[in-house]
A protein has these predicted regions:
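Short beta-strand segments within Ig-like beta-sandwich modules, predominantly Fibronectin type-III
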Residues: 340-343
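Beta-rich carbohydrate-recognition and catalytic domains
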Residues: 1-33, 40-106, 118-166, 181-183, ...
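Beta-propeller and closely related beta-sheet repeat lectin domains
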Residues: 33-36, 112-115, 172-175
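Predominantly extracellular/luminal regions of secreted and cell-surface proteins
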Residues: 64-80, 87, 231-269
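Aromatic, loop-rich ligand-recognition surfaces of beta-strand-rich domains
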Residues: 269-337, 347-391
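Surface beta-strand/loop "capping" patches
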Residues: 222-245, 282-290
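Active-site/pore-lining binding-face segments in mid-to-C-terminal subdomains
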Residues: 168-169, 173-186
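Short beta-strand segments enriched in hydrophobic/aromatic residues
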Residues: 51, 129, 188-191, 305, ...
């Protein structure tokens, strides 16, 4: 994202052809960092990007800003106005912009990854802070009622997406988009950082607008099953949860095998940096969770796979993991979900299924990509406590 030229295609799915670098008003070519394009209702095109501004007398130090440009509609690599500073790092006032895992640096923080949303005539810039690699990475909002390049003020309901604990955290560098039924949805990245420092996954959550026109996530950054945008399900104002909860998180399972340092409890510790890994000679790796004193009505599952041994250069590439999830009702094991014939590569595989009454659950891995040792970063089943005779 540091060097982003413009590409053009006849279809949203491509193919795309590079148009080259952008051309500033003085004719100098440049490539923006974290650019976002926006077309206003009148057809005028704008671009927003990160820009560092050097601090005089302090070598190597700079202030983070977001700048905006108006582009030539007939040749959109050419700037006709800008750069105009629309957001400037303000770490003394905005605690979420302060660098560090505990927002401890009051003098610096990244203000990056801008995205422009226009909703009900108001311009919103969604941006990310303070650092891609920390769990407090988040998105916040400035808005303007004047226009796409002027008058932006920091909204009071910041940050927009913020969660620092659990598997789903560091919800930054994303956007807010319109969805079905005039709804709004935040899309954000989640740091994984297992294979690469900037490795990420993508999450999404419902966004609402308060009485002052400020954006907020009514359920926050969620980690439990939610209704999809097109779900025809009656929900309350700002309500999007199915109300199913994790029933095995932080419980310690038993495993058919494991290698030293990759014990089975790593499959439920809510960390993207750890995983359970079975032994190489385990032909059907199995994890089994007892649900302690409880009996649960289990309705959904999520598996986050670890592709140990992945090596594109050597021809070891991703592929489908095949598995079966079973429940134990106190008398016998039975199938909750059968993915033994899965042909789709899903690094994170979420499924819902017919409810099963369970005192224990297990996952049996029955197939995996050639050359890869299967591992599980997270195995979670979702449900509610079951009481016989109660709804």
């Amino acid at each position: 994202s540091w060097n982003c030229p413009l590409y053009v295609g006849d279809s949203p799915t491509g193919p795309f052809t590079e148009m080259g670098p952008f051309i500033s008003m003085d004719g100098t070519p440049f490539v923006p960092c974290d650019p976002c394009l926006f077309t206003d209702d009148d057809g005028r095109i704008y671009m927003y990007a990160f820009r560092g501004v050097d601090i005089p007398g302090r070598e190597g130090e700079f202030i983070s800003t977001v700048v905006g440009y108006e582009l030539d509609r007939t040749n959109p690599v050419r700037v006709v106005n800008g750069p105009v500073t629309v957001i400037r790092q303000n770490t003394h006032a905005n605690w979420w912009e302060r660098q560090g895992g505990y927002n401890q640096d009051e003098e610096f923080g990244w203000v990056e990854g801008p995205h422009l949303l226009k909703h009900n005539g108001r311009y919103y810039i969604i941006y990310a802070s303070p650092d891609t690699c920390t769990p407090n990475y988040c998105m916040a909002v400035y808005y303007s009622d004047e226009g796409p390049l002027t008058g932006f003020v920091c909204q009071k309901k910041n940050p927009l997406t913020y969660r620092i604990e659990g598997l789903v955290k560091g919800a930054g560098h994303g956007c807010v988009e319109h969805g079905p039924g005039n709804t709004l949805w935040a899309f954000y990245t989640i740091p994984a950082r297992s294979t690469h420092e900037y490795e990420r996954r993508i999450g999404m959550d419902l966004v609402d607008v308060d009485e002052n026109g400020e954006l907020f996530c009514p359920s926050g950054v969620t980690f439990t099953p939610q209704y999809i945008p097109s779900a025809d399900t009656k929900k309350g104002a700002g309500e999007n949860s199915t109300h199913e909860l994790p029933v095995n998180t932080r419980y310690i399972p038993t495993a058919s095998s494991f290698v030293a340092g990759r014990e089975p409890h790593f499959s439920s510790d809510e960390s993207p940096l750890t995983w359970w890994q079975p032994c190489d000679d385990d032909t059907e790796p199995t994890l089994t969770f007892g649900l302690k004193q409880g009996t649960y009505r289990v309705t959904a599952s999520r598996v986050w796979w670890k592709e140990q041994g992945l090596d594109y250069a050597a021809g070891i590439v991703p592929g489908p993991f095949r598995y079966i999830i079973e429940g134990y009702n106190g008398k016998e094991w039975y199938t909750l979900l059968d993915r033994s014939d899965l042909d789709t590569d899903l690094n994170i595989d979420y499924c819902d299924f017919d409810a099963g009454i369970c005192k224990a659950v297990r996952i049996r891995i029955v197939g995996w990509p050639k050359g890869i040792t299967p591992g599980i970063v997270d195995f979670t089943v979702f449900g509610r406590r079951y009481v016989e005779g109660a709804e």
